[in-house]
Amino acid sequence: MKRFILILTCIGAALAARAQYTFTDSVQWQSYEDFNRIFLDTKKHIYRDHSARVNAVDRWNGAAAIWCQAIFYDMVQNAYRRAVAQGDKARQDKYKALHRRIYLGEKAQYVNFNFDDCNTNTGWFVYDDIMWWTVALARAYETFSSREYLTYSERSFCRVWYGSARVGDDGSYADPARGLGGGMFWEWQPIDKPKPHQKGDFRSACINFPTVIAACLLHRNVPEGRAVPTAARPTQQTKEWYLEKAREIYAWADKTLVQDGRVADGIHGGGPEFKDHLYNQGTYIGASCLLYQLTGDVAYLNKAKQGANYVFSKMCRGGILPYETGVEQGVYAAIFAQYMHTLVYECGQIQYLGMMRRNMQWAWDHRDQMRGVSNGNFLKSTEEGSQIDSYSASALPALMLMFPAGDSTSPVQGVPAADAQAGIYTIDGKCVASQGAPEQLGQLASGMYICGQRKVLVR
């Protein structure tokens, strides 16, 4: 059955007056190349934790954190998707091959994606570490259509949801039927001999909203017509189940952890514990956007915009994204970029594009000009030759990949706006359906099309 995905560029009405930016399409590609040159261990094809490292051995010796590796893995997929959107065959081939090498390197590093191995060096010992990979692997399947990516994505989701017989935990899902209150728990403790969860255990935004995102992606990609599994701990679920659980977890997390677009870090036994973090805002935006796309309920879109508005009105300084200095916190901007892309391009909210580009310009202006990498603090110049962690450095290339300098925001050339909105067109402007609807895309040959003034890749 044909599948199609929205790709990078919104072809909506022309933007209001544009600011002038000094970064170009080639500069953006180079920023990703520079990131990989400094941080990718090309022997193992996993990422190092900082620029002074020679090798990425393990958690204790040079390798970036397991969950951040998933964010860096997202970036190579984004590079490939952008190359597809731009019709750049050479880069498509390059990044498809690089993606495969990184996938195999990460799999080899992390116990062959055995999510029941909870060793604290190369294994899986926190629920959200696993769920970030669930998301990245689901996206890999959506991008490259290789069944193994979907298999590991589903296995990891179910391992988090139901727990592991080998590890002995009872799963992240805070089942209301068990009196646990709803949502998702962040961890199990002790790691090697877990106790059953209690209602007051920590339920964080960083597991709840990624769970929603993962469930939405799996709903979008698993086949229809599956039988309902009967095992106590299944390794896959039905298409309908994933959407049902996405909506359930979102409803709990939105009610419990969010106030007017501001996302709390989590909750123990009392009220929400508010501390602003950019990645929590990002995953709230992403979860809201995906549910809007799947259900058509505009309330989800409005919540996504509330989350974005809170960032730019309350968390930014002069419109520049906040930078946090805690271990691994530099990666937060890369996560935010991922889901702001969804809001801007896939949900048509181009009013945020200028703010994202402003941040890209500041990041670019404050890079180390010799190495091409940034310290992640867009308000502070990066000292030449200084030690930089890969988490913080990921912000610049992540933004550059997701918000192309050469975006076409003008209507399809030579076609009245009303007709362009209604029809399906090839990239060169040939009409293939004058009254196009998204469901018609499945009847077309594989390739790139414009439908509803958005680029769509049909597989």
Each predicted region: which residue ranges?
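Positively charged n-region of N-terminal signal peptides that target proteins for export
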Residues: 1-4, 459
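Hydrophobic h-region of N-terminal signal peptides that target proteins for export
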Residues: 8-18
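CBM-like carbohydrate-recognition segments
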Residues: 20-128, 143, 163, 167-182, ...
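Mobile, glycine-rich extracellular loop/lid and propeptide segments
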Residues: 124-137, 144-156, 160
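Aromatic- and glycine-enriched pocket-lining scaffold segments that form the walls
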Residues: 150-248
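Noncatalytic carbohydrate-binding groove/subsite architecture in carbohydrate-active enzymes
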Residues: 209-210, 214-275, 282, 287, ...
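C-terminal outer-membrane/trafficking sorting elements
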Residues: 413-459
